[in-house]
Amino acid sequence: ASPDQPIFFGGINVYLQHKFSLFRHTPKWIDKAFDSKWLLRKAAARSGMTSSKDLGEITLSTFRGEDGPLVKEVNKVLTWFKEQGSPDILFLSTIMLAGIGKVLKRELNIPVYGFLQGEDSFLDSLLPEYRVEASKLLSHDVALLDGCIAPSKYFGDLMAERLSLKPSKIKHHPNGITTERILPAEDVPSSPSLGYLARLCPLKGLDILVDAFIELKDSGNHDNLSLKIAG
């Protein structure tokens, strides 16, 4: 990313504005200092110290958007778009940004869509007392967007049910890559391999794949088989 690229909802500013009302009214130069890459890297290294309670409360503050303690961060995003020029259409990388998306849709008068990608896992990781409220807030804000884009019909149907969304709100577009400029390898390996390209975590089934690979190797019928993973 460009060094001049603005940072929105920087972790330090979000935490301070969530915890202390004083930081909801600080001048821009202070916010910019807290958004320095050096400080954010330091904070990221200590992210494991955030308690489940803090995570739940900050999630609710973020989802509340303009109606919560992080309204200053929402306005920063809106101001940036007004200064740079409104896009013809806006795609949110995740529907968890719907609280911001609904504001941009209303104030910029543009269509806004959100991608569905693993929000169920995040919601399930919250403590029960925060999970219910977070789901309600998300359901309300996502319904105000022009629609959602799911990587599969299964996940689209799952999230539509969880967030009480109309089926017409969900569009399906499978993940993939453009292969037009990719040429076949000239030197094809003589031994076969299993490939995995996704997030390296049990939620994606990587542990099951590894167990299956071990069983294949132990069978004695696939001595030359290798497992190649990336993500």
What are these regions (language model features)?
Residues 2-75:
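A conserved catalytic-core segment of Leloir-type glycosyltransferases
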Residues 64-66, 98-99, 114-131, 144:
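A short, histidine- and acid-enriched strand-loop-helix "catalytic/donor-clamping" loop
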Residues 78-82, 106, 130-148:
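Membrane-proximal helix-turn-helix segments that form the acceptor-binding/catalytic region
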Residues 78-97:
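Short N-terminal targeting/anchoring amphipathic segment
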Residues 89-91, 104-122:
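Active-site proximal beta-strand in glycosyltransferases
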Residues 91, 143-153, 228:
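A short beta-strand/loop micro-motif in the catalytic core of glycosyltransferases
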Residues 154, 176:
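Carbohydrate-associated surface elements
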Residues 187-204, 210-214, 227-228:
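Conserved donor-binding/catalytic core segment of Leloir-type glycosyltransferases
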